[in-house]
């Protein structure tokens, strides 16, 4: 095959939808980061979700990039998930004004969750990005958060020293409970 035809085939392949999608794109590089720690949230004998924290170095540093990935073991409505999020923010001492503003901002971050669905929040530089992966499908960007206060508050649910689930936090940070 001559060089011109090879070049044409390569150009056509690159132009095809879906080509080079996945962990090779810079926005999805977090998938290849090593795990810092992992934890499972249970209620009684029911598993609610499994979570993992990832970072480029495999160690957590608050100001460095990191990704929180949650795999749900149960169906959860978007309203119930938002209520749980707001309840955790209330526990952490955020004001009603902040919680209402953030709830509005997160309106499109996720929909109803089904067993096996995954959500990820990737924090880097001055922003955060929400991703959703319905069971058996590819990751999709659902929301970019430019509000650093919101990005920090969302992660505080799991990573704050004042979290409602300190053992869960320690496990995510790779610490021994």
What would you call each of these model-derived segments?
Residues 1-9:
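Bacterial N-terminal signal peptides that target proteins for export
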Residues 15-18:
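N-terminal signal peptide c-region/cleavage motif recognized by signal peptidases
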Residues 21-177:
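Terminal leader/tail segments of proteins
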